[in-house]
Amino acid sequence: QTSEKEGRSESRQERQELEETEIVTKSHQKNDWMEAEEKKKEEKEKEEEEEEKPKPGSIEENQLKDEKTKKDKESKNILSLCL
C-alpha cells in the first residue's frame, strides 16, 4: 500500500512539474511575442519620425534655390532700372 501511495504522489508531483513547466514556457513565449510587437511598434514610430524630418540636404538645396531666386529678381530689377 505504501509503494502505491508513493507511486501516486510521484506521478502527481510529475504532473505538477509538467504543468508548471508548460505555464512558464507559455509565459516566456507570450513575453517574447509582446517584446517583438513592441519593438516593431518602436521601429515603425522611428521610421515615421525620420520621414517627417526634412533631410539636411534638402534644406541646403532649398536655401540655395531661394538665394538664386533672390539674385535673379535683383538682376531683373537692376536691368529694369537701367532701361
From Swiss-Prot:
Signal peptide: none annotated. Residues 1-44, 62-76 have a biased composition (Basic and acidic residues). GO terms for cellular component: myofibril; stress fiber. In non-muscle cells, phosphorylation by CDC2 during mitosis causes caldesmon to dissociate from microfilaments. Phosphorylation reduces caldesmon binding to actin, myosin, and calmodulin as well as its inhibition of actomyosin ATPase activity. Phosphorylation also occurs in both quiescent and dividing smooth muscle cells with similar effects on the interaction with actin and calmodulin and on microfilaments reorganization. Its main location: cytoplasm. Keywords: Actin-binding, Calmodulin-binding, Cytoplasm, Cytoskeleton, Muscle protein, Phosphoprotein. It is found in: Cytoplasm, Cytoskeleton; Cytoplasm, Myofibril; Cytoplasm, Cytoskeleton, Stress fiber. Residues 1-63 are annotated as: Myosin and calmodulin-binding. It comes from the Eukaryota. GO terms for molecular function: actin binding; calmodulin binding. Residues 1-83 are annotated as: Disordered. The N-terminal part seems to be a myosin/calmodulin-binding domain, and the C-terminal a tropomyosin/actin/calmodulin-binding domain. These two domains are separated by a central helical region in the smooth-muscle form. Actin- and myosin-binding protein implicated in the regulation of actomyosin interactions in smooth muscle and nonmuscle cells (could act as a bridge between myosin and actin filaments). Stimulates actin binding of tropomyosin which increases the stabilization of actin filament structure. In muscle tissues, inhibits the actomyosin ATPase by binding to F-actin. This inhibition is attenuated by calcium-calmodulin and is potentiated by tropomyosin. Interacts with actin, myosin, two molecules of tropomyosin and with calmodulin. This is Non-muscle caldesmon. It comes from Bos taurus.
